[in-house]
From Swiss-Prot:
Residues binding ATP, per UniProt: 129-184
GO cellular component: cytoplasm
Designated name of the protein: D-alanine--D-alanine ligase
Class in the EC hierarchy, top level: ligase
Cofactor note: Binds 2 magnesium or manganese ions per subunit.
Annotated Gene3D superfamilies: 3.40.50.20, ATP-grasp fold, A domain, ATP-grasp fold, B domain
Keyword Nucleotide-binding: yes
Pfam families: Dala_Dala_lig_C, Dala_Dala_lig_N
Boundaries of every ATP-grasp domain copy: 100-301
InterPro entries tied to this protein: ATP-grasp, ATP_grasp_subdomain_1, D-Ala_lig_Van_CS, D_ala_D_ala, Dala_Dala_lig_C, Dala_Dala_lig_N, PreATP-grasp_dom_sf
Annotated PROSITE patterns: ATP_GRASP, DALA_DALA_LIGASE_1, DALA_DALA_LIGASE_2
Length: 304
């Protein structure tokens, strides 16, 4: 099969996208597929894509222009089959505010929050503390990999956190900090149903699962022995399937939760999760006893 892997792009997550794309391409080539990689940052990438005439496109793009529905819209216009979620699901999951609204409407717990939609209308620190408690989280509304995220404990830290977050987006989420443990759930669509991969308890050296912890060697441990009850684990599965069905997730997705007192709180949905050799979803696939190459082929079959 002739497959084009789209990677790179211009978002702050470019480095991870390149690694994800190379891992996907190498794995599919090893299984006998004809695979080309194409960086969407090059000016004429659409022309190059059309010249390649792929049977299927495998987007490995993270962040803006990759997970926000734009590339999905382009591929739909060009009538090229592609792996993953459609425009609607991509738009919703890329926007942390919209994701939270869907979660609340679906009966899925999520940390309390304040939506900042205008840089000139930012609430006072003390108002935020009264509503969300201290510490609280400041993060861009539409950037992944915890880029621009800060844990705020004081008014002075709040100013610094706002400046950092506004570097990446003009819309922010101020979010309640729940001091629990982080769990990530991978799932993928196959034959009209969602199959849930083994959840991972992310053991991190600090209170925040930040960029360095996610992607640098030795940053975090992946533990499959979750310190929760069977009932709480079932809620993780139920919540994940429910919201992915409502949103319309396609291909594979990763959902991040914080768990406290047996209650999972949804943080975000990643419609194009990292696919590097060290990423969470490939690890979950291996732990489930599946071959990663076969898994990628299943995603392609679902797209065709």
């Amino acid at each position: 099969m002739n497959i084009v892997v789209l990677f790179g792009g211009t978002s702050p997550e470019r480095e991870i996208s390149l690694k994800s794309g190379e891992n996907i391409a190498a794995t599919l080539r090893a299984r006998g597929h004809q695979v080309e990689t194409l960086d969407t940052a090059v000016p004429n990438f659409v022309e190059q894509l059309m010249q390649l005439k792929p049977d299927c496109v495998f987007p490995a793009l993270h962040g803006a222009d990759g997970e926000d529905g734009k590339i999905q819209g382009l591929l739909s216009i060009l009538h090229i089959p592609y792996v993953g979620s459609d425009v609607r699901a991509s738009v919703i999951t890329m926007d942390k505010y919209l994701t939270k609204l869907v979660a609340l409407q679906s009966g899925i717990p999520t940390p309390s929050f304040i939506y900042v939609y205008d840089p000139h209308l930012v609430p006072d620190y003390w108002d935020v503390e009264r509503k969300l408690g201290s510490p609280f989280i400041v993060k861009p509304c539409d950037v992944g990999s915890t880029i621009g995220l800060s844990l705020v404990r004081s008014a002075s830290e709040y100013e610094v956190a706002l400046e950092e977050a506004f570097r990446f987006s003009d819309r922010l989420l101020l979010e309640e900090f729940i001091d629990g443990f982080e769990v990530t759930v991978g799932l993928f669509r196959l034959g009209g149903d969602f199959l849930v991969l083994p959840p991972i308890y992310v053991v991190k050296p600090d209170r925040i699962f930040d960029y360095d912890t996610k992607y640098k060697p030795g940053g975090a441990k992946h533990v499959y022995d979750l310190p929760i009850s069977v009932e709480a684990r079932e809620r993780l599965t139920s919540y994940s399937k429910r919201i992915c069905k409502i949103v319309g997730i396609g291909g594979v997705a990763r959902l991040d939760y914080i768990v406290k007192d047996e209650t999972p709180y949804l943080l975000e949905i990643n419609s194009i999760p990292g696919m590097t050799a060290e990423s969470l979803v490939p690890d979950e696939v291996r732990h489930a006893g599946r071959d990663f190459g076969e898994f990628l082929e299943d995603l392609i079959k679902d797209a065709l």
